[in-house]
Amino acid sequence: MDATTIITQIATKAASASRTLSTSSREERDLVLIKIADNLEKNCDLILKANQIDMENAKSAGISQALLDRLLLTKQRVMDMAKGARDIAKLPDPLGQILIERNLANGLNLKQISVPFGVVGMVYEARPNV
């Protein structure tokens, strides 16, 4: 399977999950983050083995040492990613917050409320833990 097909499948699944998460409770969203952290920790060895393959491929492709240093995952970096997911779960819930509210001259009450905006995709060269 080529990279474009894989990325398209992942993006489609992410979009579906984002719709589900947008209507989920705070507790459900926090649980997803905790499960992400748990899975990062549980699968650390597998992640590091896959990263080793990435590192070997990058070296073969002539990637600079500076970029290789940023691409490298260590157990500590994976654990830091897990901690980051747990830290996000501890933050105040950003959804449903009234950001601006005012009464208009015509009697209407205008509110700006924070809502989920969907999936953001990011392509990066290195630094998988950032």
Predicted regions and their residues:
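N-terminal Rossmann-like NAD(P)+-binding subdomain of aldehyde/semialdehyde dehydrogenases
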Residues: 1-109
